[in-house]
Amino acid sequence: MKLLSTLAALTLITAAGTAHAADPNAGRNLAATCANCHGTNGHAIAGSGLDALAGVEKAKTLQKLADFKSGVKPASIMHQISKGYTDEQLDLIATYFAAQK
């Protein structure tokens, strides 16, 4: 019974990860939350003091997100926000913003 429960859980986790990868809008949908502070499509509002995310190299964004998630980089709210995403989701978000101009 325990083995069956474990297999069912693994199947659901795998299916959820595959669903994100198969959805061409997954990165955009996940990144929509970022617009509240960083502006629509990552174009920060002038004078806000927040970093623009649009067009930033994917690796640079991923490193910043990893630093926020681990607590290495100081932040007021990004620690909590970044911890709410899986590494796969953060990768999708970084890919989306890197493609924005």
Residue ranges of predicted features:
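Detector for the c-type heme attachment site
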Residues: 37-44, 98-99
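The canonical Cys-X-X-Cys-His
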Residues: 32-40, 93
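Stable alpha-helical elements in mature extracytoplasmic
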Residues: 23, 30, 57, 64, ...
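Bacterial N-terminal signal peptides that target proteins for export
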Residues: 1-7
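C-terminal capping alpha-helices of c-type cytochrome domains
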Residues: 70-73, 82-101
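Residue-level hotspots at or immediately adjacent to binding/recognition sites across diverse folds
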Residues: 21, 40, 81, 96
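Gly/Gly-Pro-rich "capping" loops immediately C-terminal to redox-active cysteine motifs
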Residues: 42-70, 79
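Electrostatic cytochrome c docking/interface patches
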Residues: 12-31, 45, 49, 67
